[in-house]
UniProtKB/Swiss-Prot annotation:
Pfam families: TMEM18 (PF14770). GO terms for cellular component: cytoplasm; nuclear membrane. The keyword Lipid metabolism does not apply. A motif (Nuclear localization signal) lies at residues 130-138. Keywords: Coiled coil, Cytoplasm, DNA-binding, Membrane, Nucleus, Transcription, Transmembrane, Transmembrane helix. Residues 113-140 are annotated as: DNA-binding. It is found in: Cytoplasm; Nucleus membrane. GO terms for molecular function: DNA binding. It comes from Homo sapiens. This is Transmembrane protein 18. InterPro entries: TMEM18 (IPR026721). It is a multi-pass membrane protein. Residues 116-140 form a coiled coil. The gene is TMEM18.
Length: 140
């Protein structure tokens, strides 16, 4: 069982944070479920551009608000947690909240780049076909 955290003795390394966190706490399981649903939405939204843009913007806004969420959680941690995980440096919230959201956002950006490359390839192929058609008409 992990020891109780205090803000002054909060671990500074990622492995220490991950190993000293009590992952059985209901709010952390809820957060893990939230991240799983975000990944699912990222995968399912690949065919709906508007949904994907909205999802991406929500992810970025949540990451932007992480500092404020950390401050609120640091003041009210007794209401939902056994331990004080929320330090002033924001290490914990960065690892368990922001990092997965940023990974999701990066996946969306990679999907956009992939789609853009495919469209550019299709466009170039269409241009080549049109060019070839014109060349054949001139020969006839």
């Amino acid at each position: 069982m992990p020891s109780a955290f205090s803000v002054s003795s909060f671990p500074v390394s990622i492995p220490a944070v991950l190993t000293q966190t009590d992952w059985t706490e209901p709010w952390l399981m809820g957060l893990a479920t939230f991240h799983a649903l975000c990944v699912l939405l990222t995968c399912l939204s690949s065919r709906s551009y508007r949904l994907q843009i909205g999802h991406f913007l929500c992810l970025v806004i949540l990451v932007y608000c992480a500092e404020y969420i950390n401050e609120a959680a640091a003041m009210n941690w007794r209401l939902f947690s056994k331990y004080q995980y929320f330090d002033s440096r924001g290490m914990f919230i960065s690892i368990v909240f922001s990092a997965p959201l940023l990974v999701n956002a990066m996946i969306i950006v990679v999907m956009w780049v992939w789609k853009t490359l495919n469209v550019m390839t299709d466009l170039k192929n269409a241009q080549e076909r049109r060019k070839e058609k014109k060349r054949r008409r001139k020969e006839d």
